[in-house]
Amino acid sequence: MKLQKNYKFWFCTGSQDLYGDECLAHVAAHSKEIVAALNASGVLPYEVVWKPTLITNELIRKTFNEANIDEECAGVITWMHTFSPAKSWILGLQELRKPLLHLHTQYNVEIPYDTIDMDFMNENQAAHGDREYGHIVTRMRIPRKVVVGHWSEKDVQEKIAAWQRTAIGIIESSHIRVMRVADNMRNVAVTEGDKVEAQLKFGWEVDAYPVNEIAESVAAVSESDTNELVDEYYDKYEILLEGRDPAEFKRHVAVQAQIELGFERFLEEKNYQAIVTHFGDLGALKQLPGLAIQRLMEKGYGFGAEGDWKVAAMVRLMKLMTAGMKDAKGTSMLEDYTYNLVPGKEGILEAHMLEICPSIADG
């Protein structure tokens, strides 16, 4: 399952036409230079795309609506190179539906005291323009990230990178579909929730299927496909038999292989990115899906136990947000089980039967 998609972020620079063609040409050139530097930094996980300078109400509105309908656009970065009258931004900002970052920066690092003139003052007004823009987005109470500092600084780039991952979470949240095998585990409270509200607020779609309908998909997996996956298991994992009969053990492993293939095919066919099971309703399944769930999570699927669709959606979302992230430690469903209350060594042992994602394993 593909985790890191080809999302892009639009870089939109604000100005106005009264500065003249020469000044606006410099504004565009500087913006392109900033975009090129951000992309070449190696810090940002996603590409930044330069857009023509926004100087009118109509152009701002048109650009933001194009961002709304562009499926590759995951967010908009705005910066005011010169002064840009903020009333020109109102309609566009009202209609923007993509995540927004306000980059409060400027082209130059320092004031050129020895050479500064009116041309420089006319062209470089980020401190003035970004305050005007910041005023209107605050007045409109528009959620956004504000990053302050010079665009060449690594800490600024890292803040933009972190926002990009958050923006991906916002965009991808509306594409998450959770498949529940059966329903909530009987009498369990914490795994319940308001699925309608979740779809309204987050975009999550949660559907339940009879366990035996999914079991039919498992039963349809051929013996040859199952054996091929079992061979993959035996190549990948260290098998500890500990006195077990090897042939019998392998038959049990084959059940998990068949479940993995059956579940994955069902998920792909129905276009779900997360799955929920619970051990109180296994129907025709021969075993609790354990190793099968481990491997589905490793491939990028979300998972929640005992009917917990919220955890399943969040596991999927966190996997998407951290995809390709250096030093990412992995994402898994876990439950708090028991405490260690020794003073100075307090901790919680977390687990959940067999359904732990290998991405968090040490080794």
Language model features by range: what are they?
Residues 3-26, 175-184:
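Short beta-strand segments enriched in small/hydrophobic residues
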Residues 18-20, 57-58, 84-87, 109-110, ...:
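Flexible loop/turn segments at secondary-structure boundaries
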Residues 25-41:
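Short catalytic helix/loop segments, enriched in acidic residues and glycine
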Residues 45-47, 104, 109-244, 248:
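Cap/lid and interdomain-hinge subdomains that line or gate substrate/regulatory clefts
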Residues 52-66, 156:
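Structural motif
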Residues 60-73, 90-92, 260-269:
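Short, well-structured alpha-helical segments in soluble
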Residues 81-82, 98, 104, 111-127, ...:
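Anaerobic metallocofactor- and corrinoid-dependent redox/one-carbon enzyme cores
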Residues 96-100, 142:
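A short helix->loop->beta-strand "cap" motif at the edges of active sites that frequently abuts
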